[in-house]
Amino acid sequence: MFEVTVSKRLLKSGIIVSAMTLISRVLGLVRDVVVANLMGAGASADVFFFANRIPNFLRRLFAEGAFSQAFVPVLTEYHASGDINKTRDLIARASGTLGVLVTIVTLIGVLGSGAVTALFGAGWFLDWLNGGPAAGKFELASLLLKITFPYLWFITFVALSGAILNTLGKFAVSSFTPVFLNVMMILCAWYLSPNLEQPEVGLAIGVFLGGLVQFLFQLPFLIKAGVLVRPKWGWKDPGVVKIRTLMIPALFGVSVSQINLLFDSFVASFLQTGSISWLYYSDRLLEFPLGLFGIAIATVILPALSRKHVDAHSDGFAHTMDWGIRMVTFLGIPAMLGLMVLAKPMLMVLFMRGEFTPSDVEQASYSLLAYSSGLLSFMLIKVLAPGYYSRQDTKTPVRYGIIAMVSNIVLNAIFAWFYGYVGLAVATSMSAFLNMALLYRGLHLQGVYHLTRKTVWFVARLAMAGAVMTGALLWQLDTMATWLSWGISQRALTLTGLIGLGVASYLAILLLLGVRLKDLKAATE
């Protein structure tokens, strides 16, 4: 009975988060369509995506990634004590300490944007030093970084607020908040960029304004929940010390994939023009199912696992992990295979207009195919990593994270030499698989979680259904030349039909194999 209650509660929370995330992701795709039409995949696009990736990397490293994974278990522990004053004091001291640190980092980024660009865009910097053809990229990237870097400050507090609200069971607010970034970027792309000599500056301003609006949006909900407090410096506060202790190793453990993506940008700055853009558009399509399913499930599973750990409920902990694994594989397998088969049609329908050419579709499809092969690994990492952080164990995943990161660097050097930017995507996917495998192995060896026979059989049936779905899609898929001969309406209708065919065939085979909705609940074996 317990596992049924857990599954229903988590499923309800997961649906809420997924619904809010869906709105944000759809608007994110609209934003990317607008950006592709405005800039395509040329030099300007490369520079903007570079300038936007660095603060986003730091956001996931400090805010949504390591900080949230360290903060939520500690906050859950304080909240479970029932002492609201103690909880409010922890929030005040954590926000004050984090605020000082992120302000310093933001100032360094803005004032030292040239140095940051030289560090992560070394290829452009060397061209600038030698008066090469990419010298203008370095100067523009430094300018854009000055505008986009303050986004880190805003979004850090957005992530902090979201972690607090999620711990209190209010998942919808934080899941809906990213909508405002997409809205501001779309508005700036439509109304500001066309009136500027450098359109990418308008997009950078959109990033800044998006962060500001997200920050302001969550304040009323914090007030209503009674947790909007005045920040205090608390470096040596016991709660903050515990968060720091958990956070430092988590900087690697939870953000390895982001470090890998940033390293991809570093290597890509030495490659042909368009490489960063092709990788970006591929990553954006990958992020849609990853955010809609993987991150949404991870968002609700971390507080749940933390509560089970505080209550010393080992069975509940395992049931929650099992639910996460089943949901991620049920959704992730068809998403991964669908992206791989429909890479070119999706890129055509979404991005091929304005400055984004058929050649860009061809190039981006190769990196999307490579990235997509790692989608299930990325999603499983989002579920497996909280299995450590909820127990306040950050040292184990950091070891695995370092191994995966080093493997990515080595594989980058090998594959980029032979396959260019596509090799970077292949290396990222392979290192993600390694990280995922190590995380599961660690949980198994610690006796915390192991796959039951029922879950293994469940996943095997998902794989069989996915194989049939892939065959059905390939059977109906026309050549790229045929797709190019169609208008946008026919492309969109055909893609919609193919997606419908994929979903229908996947679910039909699952039904024939005996899979039912009740199988998505945690195994009790």
UniProtKB/Swiss-Prot annotation:
It is found in: Cell inner membrane. Pathway: Cell wall biogenesis; peptidoglycan biosynthesis. GO terms for biological process: cell wall organization; lipid translocation; lipid-linked peptidoglycan transport; peptidoglycan biosynthetic process; regulation of cell shape. Disulfide bonds: none annotated. GO terms for molecular function: lipid-linked peptidoglycan transporter activity. The chain crosses the membrane at residues 10-30, 32-52, 100-120, 140-160, 171-191, 203-223, 247-267, 285-305, 330-350, 368-388, 402-422, 423-443, 455-475, 495-515. Its main location: membrane. Involved in peptidoglycan biosynthesis. Transports lipid-linked peptidoglycan precursors from the inner to the outer leaflet of the cytoplasmic membrane. It comes from the Bacteria. It is a multi-pass membrane protein. InterPro entries: Lipid_II_flippase_MurJ/MviN (IPR051050), MurJ (IPR004268). One of its GO terms (cellular component) is plasma membrane. Keywords: Cell inner membrane, Cell membrane, Cell shape, Cell wall biogenesis/degradation, Membrane, Peptidoglycan synthesis, Transmembrane, Transmembrane helix, Transport. Belongs to the MurJ/MviN family. This is Probable lipid II flippase MurJ.
